[in-house]
């Protein structure tokens, strides 16, 4: 969740330049058109801090065309905004082709971000306020925490929310890899509906040869990050992650092109490629088009869960980038956590089965220390001898969606609570354990056993 490996100059200068213009165009386009921010703020706050090379990028915005073009040392990248689906890098396609692809998108509703969240009070309001302050406090000489939003829910009630300057309850914020958990929920909806079998092979078209050992990879193994596929995850030029996200138009095909590094089901490896294979399986299961996939995400998850700000951005093929590209307000990220806290029920409607909610919380068999479940991170054991939890001051039942820069949607069943923290922390400056422990200490442990 930090950027300790995010040195954009590693992997060769050509890779570094290509990666830099790609990420700059993509972040700028999404930041302006999805999040509603000023281009200058996105460039100075999000892009330039990534590396020395990123400080050289020139980003040009065309509001009427819905594009951002990023250039650096003779290389350029273009990202296109399309209403309803956000920004997409124009790779192996054209602006016109992407606009045509979006013509059949279904309409969306709109409403106030906080309409469904009643207010509540913490057991110790002063202590909660102090904990909230600490999450935003910065060293005046060298600010590096960059918390942008913090939301606390308990029993379905909003106990606290706070935002950094330039952000508000109406600002959709990128989840990075926290998006994986949302993609997992869409897979869970298919499983709940009987449209996808966890134990069935993923049936990637690239693996049709009878002697291809990758044919054995199942939906469950992808969900639990034990597919055995080779994948270099660190965000550095030339890695599989940056190549897939910023240099390929069809991300699932790229992930499917990678060889096995281990027998499926035997080794746990956190990586983004498997998630985008699940994204393609989702689209294939619901009709095979971008419009069908977006409509399914909207009608089956976002609308009934009240996540009406959610924008799940696709690649050029139209497949949602489940590994990385969900934007939503902090309150809607909290609604996502609440859906899981409430056993898959929202607004009196069952969205995910109880079995699925138990599945995503359960430790993946191959994950060391039980640190991973079904597309959710867990508070696993970091020291097998001492049996010390990774976050020792937080409950053992905590599980969470987590992404680069410390995007966190943490679910605490024992406290009937959800804590959402979103930001742009390019170091270890944000102390998740300490911050969330202080918040939990300030709120009354809940005796409620049912959905809030």
Predicted regions and their residues:
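Active-site helix/loop module of the DD-peptidase/beta-lactamase fold
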Residues: 193-230, 257-260, 287-324, 328, ...
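Beta-lactamase-like hydrolase cores
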Residues: 115-155
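Structured C-terminal helix/loop/strand segments within mature extracytoplasmic catalytic/sensor domains
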Residues: 4-16, 21, 42, 398-452
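Active-site Gly/Thr loop motif
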Residues: 307-314, 361-418
């Amino acid at each position: 969740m930090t950027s300790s490996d995010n040195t954009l100059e590693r992997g060769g200068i050509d890779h570094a330049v290509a990666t830099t213009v790609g990420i700059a165009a993509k972040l700028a386009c999404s930041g302006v058109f999805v999040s509603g921010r000023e281009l200058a703020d996105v460039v100075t706050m999000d892009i330039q801090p990534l590396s020395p090379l990123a400080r050289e990028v020139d980003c040009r915005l065309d509001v009427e065309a819905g594009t951002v073009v990023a250039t650096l040392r003779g290389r350029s990248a273009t990202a296109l905004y399309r209403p309803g689906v956000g920004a997409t890098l124009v790779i192996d396609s054209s602006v016109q082709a992407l606009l045509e692809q979006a013509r059949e998108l279904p309409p969306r509703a709109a409403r106030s971000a906080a309409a469904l969240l009643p207010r509540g009070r913490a057991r110790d309001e002063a202590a909660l306020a102090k904990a909230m302050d600490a999450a935003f406090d910065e060293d005046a000489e060298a600010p590096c925490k960059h918390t942008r939003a913090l939301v606390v829910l308990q029993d379905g009630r909003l106990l606290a929310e706070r935002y950094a300057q330039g952000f508000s309850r109406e600002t959709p914020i990128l989840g990075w890899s926290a998006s994986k958990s949302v993609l997992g929920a869409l897979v869970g909806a298919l499983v709940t509906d009987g449209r996808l079998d966890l134990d069935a092979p993923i049936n990637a078209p690239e693996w049709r040869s009878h002697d291809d050992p990758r044919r054995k990879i199942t939906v469950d193994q992808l969900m639990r990050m034990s597919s055995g596929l080779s994948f270099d995850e660190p965000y550095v030029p030339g890695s599989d992650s940056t190549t897939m996200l910023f240099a390929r138009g069809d991300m699932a095909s790229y992930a499917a092109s990678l060889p096995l590094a281990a027998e499926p089901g035997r080794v746990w490896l956190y990586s983004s490629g498997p998630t985008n294979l699940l994204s393609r399986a989702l689209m294939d299961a619901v009709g095979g088009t971008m419009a069908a996939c977006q409509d399914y995400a909207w009608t089956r998850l976002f609308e009934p869960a009240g996540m009406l700000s959610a924008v799940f951005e696709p690649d050029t093929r139209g497949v949602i980038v489940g590994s990385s590209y969900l934007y939503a307000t902090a309150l809607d990220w909290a609604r996502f956590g609440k859906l899981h806290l409430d056993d898959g029920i929202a607004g009196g409607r069952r969205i995910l089965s109880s079995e699925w909610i138990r599945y995503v919380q359960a430790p993946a068999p191959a994950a060391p220390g039980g640190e991973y479940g079904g597309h959710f991170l867990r508070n696993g054991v970091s020291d097998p001898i001492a049996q010390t939890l990774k976050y020792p001051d937080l409950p053992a039942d905590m599980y969470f969606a987590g992404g680069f820069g410390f995007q966190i949607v943490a679910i605490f069943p024992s406290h009937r609570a959800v804590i959402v923290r979103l930001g742009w922390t390019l170091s270890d400056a944000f102390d998740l354990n300490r911050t969330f422990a202080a918040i939990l200490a300030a709120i009354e442990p809940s005796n409620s056993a049912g959905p809030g």
